[in-house]
Structures are given as C-alpha cells and as structure tokens.
C-alpha cells in the first residue's frame, strides 16, 4: 500500500471557502493527517452506489479493487467508469456474489449501495471481514436489523458512516451553527417535515422472463419473492413494502435525521402515524401515497407529512423541514434555508443557498450515469466521505454514526408500524422492545426468506 495525505488544498479550492471551512470545523475533520491508500469495494453499482464511490475517489487516496452487483450489465458498466476515474486506471475485479468478494479481497472500506432489504446482511458481513462501512440510508428494513448493525459495529470496532449527508451539507451546517445553536429561534416546540415529490412509481407491468444478465434470485435475497415484472432498479423496487418502508423510510429519514442533529434529539418518547393509498389506487405499488407521522419529545412535536400527488404546501420547499421557535422560524431543505424572525427585535432575515462545485469538479456534470447525480448533494457527500475517513484514521465515530442512523431509520419504521396497528408506539431501545404491545413487537423483526438468516443483535 502506498501512503499519501488527503489533499486538503485540492478540496478547499472546490468549495465556497467560508462554508467549506465552517463545515470542516463543525464536523471535527482534520484533513492534514496522513492517510493510506484505502482498498475499497462497492456492493450495488447502480445510481447512488456509483455516485458515492466517485465522490470518495474525488477527495481521497483510494484504490477500487472490487465491484459487486447481481446485474452483469450494471457491474461491467461500472467497472469501465471506475477504470477511467481512479488514479491507477486499473479495472476492479467483478463479482455477482458479495460474500465471495469479501472472502477473496482484503478490504479497508466497503460502500453499500444496494436496496434496503440487503443493507443489514451486507454491512454486518463486511464488518466481520474487517472492513469499515459506508452504507446508504435507511440502514435497515426492520428495527432488529438496525440493532444488529449497531451491535456489529461496536463488537468489531468498525467505523460505519450512514449516507445521511445532510449533516455534511455546508448551508445546513451554517444554519445549525449560526441560527439554531446561536439561539436565534428561541424556545423550540414544534417541527414540521414534509415531502411532496411525485416519486411513487406505479403501473401494471406484465410478469415477464428474467433476463439472463440479472440474478433475480440473489437480488431478492432475504425479501419475499415477487413475480419479475421488469428491472427493479432506480425507483421501481422502492414502491414495494417487500423491499423497504416507502416514502417514510426513504425521505422522512433524511429530514428527521437532520432535525435530530440540529436539535440534539435522541429517541422519540412516542411515535404515531396514519395514512394509506388514498388517491393513486391503480397500479401495483403497495406503499402509501399519503401519510402523516408524529414523533414526540418533551415539549416538542416533530410532524411529518408526505403526498405523492397534488401540489406542495410551499413550492420553494417541497422536501424540507421547518423549525418553529418563539423568536423565529427556520425553514430548510437540501437546496437552501431561510431564517424568519418574529419581529425586528429578534434579528434580520437570513437566506443561504446550496453550495455547488461544478467548476472544480466538472465530472459532476458530465458523469455518464443514469439518472444523473444529484448535483446539490455532491459537495455534501465529499465532506461526508472525508468525515468518514477522519473517523477511521483517528479511531473515532463519524458524524452519521450507525447508531444515529439506526435511531432515525427505526423511528420511521416504527411510524409505519404504528400506522399498521392503528395506535401510538413507545419503543424501549435498551430492551429492544415496544412497551406493552405484543402485536407490535412481532413486527420488529421481519421474516426472512430461506435460506437467509435474520441477524441477531446478541449474536453478531
């Protein structure tokens, strides 16, 4: 292995200086420490898997030695791009089975970009194999999976960074530091969070033969087997509860995680939710098109709402959170934030926009991926990767540590469970049980399809 420093100057030039430096300081990063060339592998070479990997390549000395995907076309296409992008120009080894990949390679870092139903098994196996893990959110499809992932990270002493990169988003770091932490909001007692994107894939595609390039059996893995009705990539798999937790698990987890970070919140004291398929009744999708949830804390309610139809309440903030204080209001999204004081005595209005780095990283724009990367998320993901590496090198925990990712993910899963059983739920994380509710407790752990075995937090 060769040794070289993380290129601090190269990174700083690419960001708006003040916000970037503020972000680095807030995240506790030290980019001047030496760092080895990390041996990296990616499991899941689709849209966000490649996007995460390429952001890491942009800012740190890494060698991508292996790629794994059950879609032969996806992994071969990704290998070609990686060979063009990484410094060595080497083509990584290709695998259709991640377990074989872990057995045959000594890896420092494994990035997991697979669908939600595979996250837990792959992350735990990667940690057992000696790798640190960067896993996309939500971390799990059920609560006990998440508990097992946290237990594994602690047992094997591995850094696990969750892809909730809003904590590494420069303008949101600025909002936390200069609005929330500065006390400009006053006493905070209510938060609204929402998503009004028309993102619920639907339709009635016919059942069809599985193409030769796709191992659909392994793609399905521990999830229930659905009849094959076309490539599940990008958004089709997200429209089924067999593989995840719908818009609640996909989009609420980001906003709720950011709010918890900004307000220093832990587990909610009680969670409730209502919703269903109220409008988009045609098609195969079985996730909600309308849902509200309440995450309760002492003297504070955090309320979520999503609709995959109609118009957003605020067209400038279709996916966002609003923190209400007695001195002012903060409304924020991945694109911008606005602080609105209640009166002149409470300060002046403040507006900040997302930071782009298209000039420094033109490949962000030209990257031949489909769909295109989220340009607004690229600077945040680079910061997030640097924080991940800093935690590895210093032996600490990253800003989006697996335990924080578990709290945010599990809270959203518990909201879906509340909707299903029709009553509020109180989760005790020490006992890993819902208080006084045997019916709901039975939902904490999904049944796995044979021969897969559900991870046990007591036996990882």
Regions found by a protein language model. Name each.
Residues 2-132, 144-159:
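N-terminal glycine-/serine-/threonine-rich beta1-alpha1-beta2 phosphate-ribose binding loop
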Residues 28, 174, 184-187, 192, ...:
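Contiguous beta-strand/loop segments that form the cofactor/metal-binding neighborhood of enzyme cores
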Residues 83-85, 152-154, 178-181, 208-210:
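Short, hinge-like loop/turn segments at secondary-structure boundaries
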Residues 94, 119, 168-171, 381:
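Conserved donor sugar-nucleotide recognition element shared by glycan-biosynthetic enzymes
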Residues 137:
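Short basic (Lys/Arg) and small-residue
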Residues 142-144, 170:
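Conserved PLP phosphate-binding loop immediately N-terminal to the Schiff-base lysine helix
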Residues 148-166, 175, 189-191:
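Rossmann-fold dehydrogenase core element
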């Amino acid at each position: 292995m060769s040794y070289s420093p993380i290129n601090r100057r190269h990174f700083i030039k690419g960001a708006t200086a003040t916000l970037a430096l503020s972000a680095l300081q807030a995240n506790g990063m030290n980019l001047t420490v030496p760092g080895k060339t990390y041996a990296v592998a990616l499991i899941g070479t689709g849209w966000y898997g490649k996007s995460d990997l390429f952001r890491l390549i942009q800012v740190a000395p890494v060698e991508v030695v292996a790629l794994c995907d059950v879609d032969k076309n996806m992994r071969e296409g990704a290998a070609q791009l990686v060979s063009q992008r990484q410094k060595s120009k080497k083509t990584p080894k290709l695998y259709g089975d991640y377990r074989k990949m872990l057995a045959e390679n000594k890896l420092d870092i494994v990035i997991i970009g697979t669908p939600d139903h595979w996250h837990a098994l792959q992350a735990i196996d990667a940690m057992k194999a000696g790798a640190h893990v960067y896993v996309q959110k939500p971390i799990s499809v059920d609560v006990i999976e998440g508990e097992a992932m946290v237990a594994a990270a602690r047992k094997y002493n591995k850094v696990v960074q969750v892809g909730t990169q809003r904590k590494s988003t420069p303008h949101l770091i600025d909002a936390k530091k200069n609005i929330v932490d500065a006390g400009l909001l006053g006493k905070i007692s209510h938060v609204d969070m929402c998503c009004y994107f028309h993102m619920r894939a639907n339709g009635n595609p016919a059942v069809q033969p599985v193409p030769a390039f796709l191992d659909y059996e392994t793609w399905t893995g521990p999830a229930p087997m659905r009849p094959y009705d076309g490539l599940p990539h990008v958004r089709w798999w997200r429209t089924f509860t067999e593989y995840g937790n719908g818009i609640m698990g996909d989009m609420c987890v980001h906003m709720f995680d950011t709010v918890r970070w900004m307000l220093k919140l832990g587990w909610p004291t009680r969670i409730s939710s209502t919703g269903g398929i109220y409008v988009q009744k045609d098609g195969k999708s079985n996730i909600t098109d309308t849902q509200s949830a309440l995450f309760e804390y002492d003297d504070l309610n955090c309320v979520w709402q999503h609709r995959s139809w109609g118009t957003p309440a605020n067209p400038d903030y279709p996916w966002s959170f609003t923190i209400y204080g007695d001195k002012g209001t903060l409304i924020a999204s991945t694109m911008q934030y606005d602080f609105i004081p209640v009166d002149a005595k409470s300060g002046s209005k403040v507006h900040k926009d997302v930071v782009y780095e298209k000039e420094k990283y033109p490949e962000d724009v030209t990257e031949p991926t489909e769909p295109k990367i989220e340009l607004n998320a690229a600077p945040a993901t680079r910061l997030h990767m640097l924080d991940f590496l800093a935690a590895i090198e210093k032996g600490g925990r990253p800003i989006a540590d697996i335990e924080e990712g578990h709290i945010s993910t599990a809270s959203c899963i518990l909201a879906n469970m509340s909707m299903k059983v029709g009553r509020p739920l109180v989760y005790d994380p020490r006992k890993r049980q819902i208080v006084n509710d045997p019916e709901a407790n039975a939902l904490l752990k999904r049944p796995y399809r044979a021969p897969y075995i559900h991870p046990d937090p007591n036996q990882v």
